[in-house]
């Protein structure tokens, strides 16, 4: 499966740095996360991915500095790919830099909102995942726990 989230209400004031926006997506079925790809434009600075589990535990899964010149998919190794029970909320946090200090910023004097043009900005992300059955999730979780306790888990 493949999921893309938009943050169409993006609001980046002129000259502002570290402008935060948040997006959420609920995993309806047990899943294994395969990859994460942040996507912003010239003012994109950083994007982080958190899992908010049904028991309200929060785990940071990925946090990357963003560079518009590099469109990178961060793939997880099989042994550490996040295993997500049904009901897990994916929380994506994005930061933008609309200041003069951002060398990629075409004009820090202007307010910037969502748009598809490079001179606009966005805070999108793509999640690549596949669904698992409850039994598959339990078995994989148990196997990882066993490997971790035996010291045989590979990263």
Can you annotate each of these PLM segments?
Residues 22-32, 80-85:
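Extracellular and analogous surface-interaction loops
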Residues 1-5:
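Conserved small/polar residues in nucleotide/adenosyl-binding loops
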Residues 16-27, 74-76:
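Short beta-strands within extracellular/lumenal beta-sheet-rich domains
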Residues 101-143:
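Glycine/proline-rich low-complexity spacer/linker segments in large multi-domain proteins
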Residues 14-17, 87:
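Solvent-exposed, conformationally flexible loop/turn segments
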Residues 138-155:
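Activation corresponds to long, low-complexity, non-globular regions
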Residues 35-118:
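Extended, compositionally biased non-globular segments
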Residues 7-11, 26:
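Conserved, well-structured core segments that form or line functional sites
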């Amino acid at each position: 499966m493949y999921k893309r989230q938009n943050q169409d209400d993006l609001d980046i004031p002129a000259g502002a740095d570290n402008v935060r926006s948040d997006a959420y997506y609920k995993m309806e079925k047990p899943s294994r996360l395969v990859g994460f790809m942040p996507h912003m434009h010239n003012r994109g600075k950083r994007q982080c991915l958190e899992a908010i589990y049904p028991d309200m535990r929060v785990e940071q899964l990925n946090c990357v500095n963003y560079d518009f010149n590099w469109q990178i998919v961060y793939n997880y190794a099989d042994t550490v790919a996040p295993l997500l029970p049904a009901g897990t909320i994916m929380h994506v946090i994005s930061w933008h830099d609309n200041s003069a200090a951002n060398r990629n910023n075409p004009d820090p004097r202007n307010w910037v909102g969502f748009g598809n043009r490079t001179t606009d900005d966005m805070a999108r992300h793509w999640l690549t995942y596949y669904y698992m059955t409850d039994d598959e999730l339990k078995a994989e979780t148990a196997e990882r726990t066993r490997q971790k306790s035996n010291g045989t888990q590979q990263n």
